[in-house]
Structure formats: structure tokens, C-alpha cells
């Protein structure tokens, strides 16, 4: 599949006058355990700016003040509140887990809670340290849901067993067959590609100016936001366009910046989406 104006406009469409926040999906983001609180904040900022209707963050209680200082638009609660966690999980259209989650006992507990309770009609975006935790589990026992994986090359090595030097298109497609049918893979690298089954889309955007902390968290937040907001669109197309837009904005910023900060990408998302929807 090629990223062109037609594909972008299939995904990013003008909003209907009679729509409301409930029309644009509910997202639950899980992560930001000490000392990685900033990661989930950046993911949430990207998710809100991408247009998700209602965004809730499950994180360390100590991280909530910082989150609301940067993003009062998001709701937040202590990740360890099990009943609230389950309520928000059941209500979500999209769950993003892994941004700043870490790999300690609480992180694994949170991932297990999500895997045990997610429903088949929900989207699960797995990013960051949750990918490493997932790599230690039996892939055949994963729940039936709409699964989206967003690993960089080393994380994909742990998940797939493919060394970085072996991560060709054909090998990656074969490895993806070990996951449930329909799984979407965003294989992040200097030549990012998005896979689903036999489909693969290579992106011709992005560069080394994106090599900074929080870049992947921001992408994961955008992917979650697009899946929530554009639920009537083919998920594969929505993920492709979110991933493309993330790096297209970075390319534009890099014309006048040596390094592109993830938060600058997030600030630019609404204006870019407005322009692309016309």
C-alpha cells in the first residue's frame, strides 16, 4: 500500500457537525511507572492532540499532578486501583499499554490484568516495555482482540526471535504469522514499515533527528488516537496514516531544527490534520 493523498483522506476526514466527544472514541493508556513518568505523559499528549474523544491514563499516583500540569484534558487514576482499572478497561475502545511501564512486578500485573479482561472488539496497542514482557509469554495464549504491536528492532528481536540482521520483509511476515490473524505490526527503524498479514507498507519519511527519548511514546499515542477517532476506517490504514503523519511532521520541523522533540510533533498534529482533511 502506498501513502498518498487519497489514502490520507480516506482516514483523516472532516468532522460531522452533530458529533460529540463520544463519537471519537475512548482510550485507556497504561504506563508511566517510576522513574518513567514522562513517557505516558507524552503518549497522552499525542493521543489527545490526535483527536481521541476521551483519554484516561492509568499511572503512578505521584505522576498524576505532572500529567495534569501538562494535559488537563486527560483523566487519570492510580494504576493500582484494581476496580477502577477494570471499569476503565471495559469502557475503552482502545487500550495502549507500555509507555514507561517498566518491567517490575506491578508492570507485569498490569499487563496480565489487561490481557485477562480485554474483549474481542477492543484494540490493544502494545508498546515499549510491555513488548518485552509480552515476549516472555506464550503468544498462542494471547486474547482475541485487535492487536497492534509497535516495536523497534531490538524489541521485535525479543518478540519474534529474529536477530536485527534477519529482519527482512519475508522473515518478518513469517514471524507475524505466530500472532493472531489480523495483528498489525509497526516495525520501527530508519526504514519504518507497517505490516498486516501479506500486506506491507514502507514509509519514506523520518530521519535521525527523531532519535530522542519519547519519540516512540508519541507515535504510540498517535496510533491509539487514530484507532479511537477513526473507528469506522480500516485499522491498517489508520495505523499507516498515523505513523506516516508522525514522521512527516518531524521532517517539516527538522527543516529548521537539528533535533525534533516529540512534544513539538504533538503540538503540530491538529493543524496538520485540519490541512489534510480539506
UniProtKB/Swiss-Prot annotation:
Every YjeF C-terminal domain range: 4-276
Cofactor: Mg(2+)
A single MF term (Gene Ontology): ATP binding
Alphabetized UniProt keyword annotations: ATP-binding, Lyase, NAD, NADP, Nucleotide-binding
Residues reported to bind (6S)-NADPHX: 39, 102, 152, 217
Keyword Oxidoreductase among UniProt keywords: no
Alphabetical list of PROSITE patterns matching this protein: YJEF_C_1, YJEF_C_2, YJEF_C_3
GO annotation (BP), single: metabolite repair
Major enzyme class: lyase
Assembly mode: Homotetramer.
NCBIfam families documented for this protein: yjeF_cterm (TIGR00196)
Family statement: Belongs to the NnrD/CARKD family.
Record function comment: Catalyzes the dehydration of the S-form of NAD(P)HX at the expense of ADP, which is converted to AMP. Together with NAD(P)HX epimerase, which catalyzes the epimerization of the S- and R-forms, the enzyme allows the repair of both epimers of NAD(P)HX, a damaged form of NAD(P)H that is a result of enzymatic or heat-dependent hydration.
Name of the molecule in the record: ADP-dependent (S)-NAD(P)H-hydrate dehydratase
Amino acid at each position: 500500500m502506498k501513502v498518498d493523498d487519497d489514502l490520507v483522506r480516506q482516514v483523516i476526514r472532516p468532522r460531522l457537525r452533530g458529533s460529540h466527544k463520544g463519537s471519537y472514541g475512548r482510550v485507556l493508556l497504561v504506563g508511566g511507572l517510576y522513574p518513567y513518568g514522562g513517557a505516558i505523559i507524552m503518549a497522552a499528549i499525542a493521543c489527545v492532540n490526535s483527536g481521541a474523544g476521551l483519554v484516561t491514563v492509568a499511572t503512578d499516583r505521584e505522576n498524576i499532578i505532572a500529567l495534569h500540569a501538562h494535559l488537563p484534558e486527560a483523566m487519570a487514576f492510580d494504576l493500582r486501583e484494581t476496580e477502577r482499572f477494570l471499569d476503565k478497561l471495559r469502557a475503552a475502545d482502545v487500550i495502549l499499554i507500555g509507555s514507561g511501564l517498566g518491567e517490575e512486578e506491578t508492570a507485569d500485573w498490569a499487563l496480565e490484568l489487561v490481557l485477562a479482561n480485554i474483549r474481542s472488539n477492543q484494540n490493544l496497542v502494545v508498546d515499549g516495555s510491555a513488548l518485552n514482557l509480552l515476549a516472555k509469554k506464550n503468544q498462542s495464549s494471547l486474547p482475541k482482540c485487535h492487536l497492534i504491536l509497535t516495536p523497534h528492532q531490538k524489541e521485535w528481536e525479543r518478540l519474534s526471535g529474529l536477530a536485527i540482521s534477519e529482519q527482512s520483509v519475508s522473515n518478518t511476515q513469517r514471524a507475524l504469522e505466530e500472532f493472531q490473524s489480523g495483528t498489525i505490526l509497526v516495525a520501527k527503524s530508519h526504514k519504518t514499515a507497517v505490516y498486516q498479514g501479506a500486506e506491507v507498507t514502507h514509509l519514506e519519511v523520518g530521519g535521525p533527528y527523531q532519535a530522542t527519548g519519547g519519540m516512540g511514546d508519541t507515535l504510540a499515542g498517535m496510533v491509539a488516537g487514530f484507532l479511537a477517532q477513526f473507528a469506522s476506517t480500516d485499522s491498517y490504514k489508520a495505523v499507516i496514516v498515523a505513523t506516516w503523519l508522525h514522521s512527516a511532521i518531524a521532517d517539516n520541523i527538522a527543516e529548521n531544527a537539528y533535533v525534533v522533540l516529540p512534544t513539538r510533533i504533538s503540538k503540530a498534529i491538529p493543524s496538520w490534520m485540519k490541512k489534510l482533511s480539506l
